[in-house]
């Protein structure tokens, strides 16, 4: 596995791979590597010849009103996991290399930002999308893989790449789960044994709401209440909301034929629930018949 901190070097490496006729994949992570990240690499290896991991755990990006602190991650641990998974190129973006002077360019996505549920303020999300756009520009033509667990981020990245006509395709991969249905996340390690035992209720509640929709429920709040009723005895729900999957627009009705309903019938139920002080997020997709 080749490791580099220089964006010019990783660009040169990937250009050489493409020139040799090989398909390139990119997987991005902020550190805290777990089985969910490795599953992205596994999918990338199925579809491409060369896999590059962009590890952003060392990166601190600043903006006019403050900064986003670097993650406190174990680089050596993550490197070992990715090398064992068969990653070819391991790129560690460094601020001094990427941003030798303050950046004045930021992505604005007002049409989507106004729909975000339970996410950080818009300025933070614009910074995040800008960072991903920067990394895709460095990677060049590629397939890039993100997990569906963070659905809102995934959709924003996909829309950004499409709107800018980047020579990259953002692919969503199914959420990797524990045998009991809990979405794999670094946050799971913060749960007490009792909280971890209760955590499967989140995905079970979302599944129950999806089943209610499949059985004919078309009121979004009523569908959410199916999940909330299961969760309140064991956790503190922050939100459960139904959105149009491709636009993140919150829905009141789930009927595609009704005004304001999902235009293509594709709905995503998004949830954030606190077990103690630890918030867990998850989501599930539902297809509502359009006829």
UniProtKB/Swiss-Prot annotation:
Its main location: cytoplasm. Its EC number is 6.3.2.1. One of its GO terms (cellular component) is cytosol. (R)-pantoate binds at residue 153. The keyword NAD does not apply. It catalyses: (R)-pantoate + beta-alanine + ATP = (R)-pantothenate + AMP + diphosphate + H(+). One of its GO terms (molecular function) is ATP binding. One of its GO terms (biological process) is pantothenate biosynthetic process. The active site is at residue 37. It comes from the Bacteria. ATP binds at residues 147-150, 184-187. It is found in: Cytoplasm. Catalyzes the condensation of pantoate with beta-alanine in an ATP-dependent reaction via a pantoyl-adenylate intermediate. Homodimer. HAMAP family: PanC. Belongs to the pantothenate synthetase family. The reaction proceeds by a bi uni uni bi ping pong mechanism. This is Pantothenate synthetase 1. It comes from Frankia alni (strain DSM 45986 / CECT 9034 / ACN14a).
